[in-house]
Amino acid sequence: MQVPESSLAHLSEWQRDAFVLSSGTCLPQQKAEVYRAHLAQIQYAWANSEISEASAVHLFKKYAEKYSAIIDSDKLEIGLNNYADSILTLAKCQRNESDKWQSSLTTNNVLKLKSVQDMAVAGRRTQLSKSSADASVRVGNGINTSGYSAGLGNNVLRNSGYTVPHAALSDCQMPGGSANFLQKPKISAFTIANTTSVANTSSNTLINNSISMTSSLMQSNEDKDPASFSGHMFLPTTSVHSGKRKAYSALGNESSDIKPNPLVQRQLTNKEATCESGFKTAKEQLWVDQQKKYSNQPQRNPSPLYGGAKKSLGAARSRGLHGKFVPPVPRQEDVQDSNRKVYGQGNSEMNAPSDERLKNIEPKMIELIMSEIMDHGPPLNWDDIAGLEFAKTTIKEIVVWPMLRPDIFTGLRGPPKGILLFGPPGTGKTLIGKCIACQSGATFFSISASSLTSKWVGEGEKMVRALFTVARCHQPAVIFIDEIDSLLSQRGEGEHESSRRIKTEFLVQLDGATTSSDDRILVVGATNRPQEIDEAARRRLVKRLYIPLPEASARKQIVVSLMAKEHCSLAEQEVEAIVLQADGFSGADMTQLCREAALGPIRSIQLMDISTITPEQVRPIAYIDFQSAFLVVRPSVSQKDLELYENWNKTFGCGR
């Protein structure tokens, strides 16, 4: 009897898994994968009626128990973290800023919980019930402005209306010098006559010893529970002061003002700072950031968070139809004006720009332009750009070498002010601009047309002027403008005045009466619509290089470079066939073709196996995957567009 091929395949997989389980070097992850494969094979065999239902139930239960034993185990030797791999795979490319996280779970927040407060109240009641005597001491004198008790003694005034239990006082252990400062009272209350004598005899002692008592009390309670400490030793400020006034008015004595103790206030401020909650609102965090940012500047006040001090919102001031609108969030100009008023003349040197050429440029524009500097990312080499040998050779001669050796390339050998890269989309114009900056060691500015435009009249030309001023301070510099046709399009009658002024300022800064021939600033523009560029801009962009579609050798280089990073099985003849069939594809189209072919092995996997298969079990990329990809990916450039580029290159281009 001949066994079907499918049964032989399942038998082979079952035997291979059995050998994996029997080996002594099998990891928990491998065991779990084997048991998952067994469960899937059991379901598949039962669905095809290859085994009976009873056998399927028995085998499924057997291997499900073994699988759950591995998954549910907490031991690292035999257990498996079933979620770590997928989570780490998703999170490995994400930025991790856990050092800036702030936990809101603090001791202060826990003590505010109702259950914790109930436990504290129950504990105090139990402690009071166990006390041998229920003595009450009236507190009235020696209270500073922070609400902290600074004047407790053997006998104090009783008219404040605030009672401190003896159990609370017994918890406070004083140093040797103040051991007799707080003692257990022998009677529960005092008469008015005794109070008069107490006020005359112990007031000086209380005032003189307030500093030593409060400092000792803070040290003795440093490590205790903040809740019990605050509940026993902090008194209500309003009731205490009112009781003090009543006591002195009843006795007929003149009240003497006791100034707050600066030592106690400093200690209380530090105590409150340590107990501060970890959570901060956006307003508080902004205030803290401003304090940190300007902490090194003397006599500086925090800038207003929402508007200036003289501005108001809501019904605080009436505004008619012609009233001035006050924004809820201050503009950058308002914040800078208020900061300049607060800093005074002492910080004029600190606020001065580092370069004299930037002193007339607004700081916000300088910051915006500096944020456009591309000084990050992997460096690019000329070999990373497939094909385009004529364009790369020309750029090396007229751009890279003059920037590397400005002493040799002087006079007529000097580099041009601008280069225009035109051609179909997806041919590598942006890569050439980045490679120019990397190979020449220049500062690379990647500017879009939207970065130089503004809705405010006059801001656009200021931004263009600031761009070239900052570039002159960072020479050699390369200003790359992608889709330059949107910025320097042809000027017409119906054009807006602000757009015309931006173009005029750009052309003047690029090559005008105020520019210097010694400036090593190169403007590289890329476009796929060269016919829409203004004539004056076309004259200033001296070198106009046509970036055509990749040739056969360039397409082969793209395929080989992309497939070298993947698991594929392509022969040399198959690669040649793919290159010939991809005639008319741009560089971006070739990349999309390889992406689509790389998904072919994934699409061949059945849906029920996608959750159990390992990356090693995915078959390599084959020639049939590229054939399927050609049915989906089409060239993005038509023959009519290619003829347009060819004609414009013959008229205005610099050869090929």
Curated annotation (Swiss-Prot):
Q: Where would you say this protein principally sits, based on its record?
A: nucleus
Q: Where does ATP bind?
A: A386, G426, T427, G428, K429, T430, L431
Membrane-spanning residues: none
* Catalytic function, reaction form: ATP + H2O = ADP + phosphate + H(+)
Question: Disordered: where is this region?
Answer: 293-354
| Listed PROSITE patterns | AAA (PS00674)
**Comp. bias (Basic and acidic residues):** 331-340
Q: Where in the cell is it found?
A: Nucleus; Cytoplasm; Cytoplasm, Perinuclear region
Q: What Pfam families does the annotation carry? A: AAA, AAA_lid_3, Vps4_C
Q: Which GO terms describe its molecular function?
A: ATP binding; ATP hydrolysis activity; hydrolase activity; magnesium ion binding; protein-macromolecule adaptor activity
Question: Required co-factor?
Answer: Mg(2+)
Q: What class of enzyme is it?
A: hydrolase
Gene Ontology annotations for the cellular component aspect, listed alphabetically = nuclear chromosome; perinuclear region of cytoplasm
Which portions of the chain have biased composition (kind: Polar residues)? Answer: 293-302
- E.C. no: 3.6.4.-
GO term, biological process aspect, one? ATP metabolic process
Entry keyword set: ATP-binding, Cytoplasm, Hydrolase, Magnesium, Metal-binding, Nucleotide-binding, Nucleus
Q: How does it assemble?
A: Hexamer.
Q: Which family does it belong to?
A: Belongs to the AAA ATPase family.
* Purpose of the protein: May be involved in DNA double-strand break (DBS) repair via homologous recombination (HR). May regulate osteoblast proliferation and differentiation.
- Report the domain remarks: The N-terminus is necessary for its recruitment to DNA damage sites.
**Record-given protein name:** Fidgetin-like protein 1
The upper taxonomy is: Eukaryota, Metazoa, Chordata, Craniata, Vertebrata
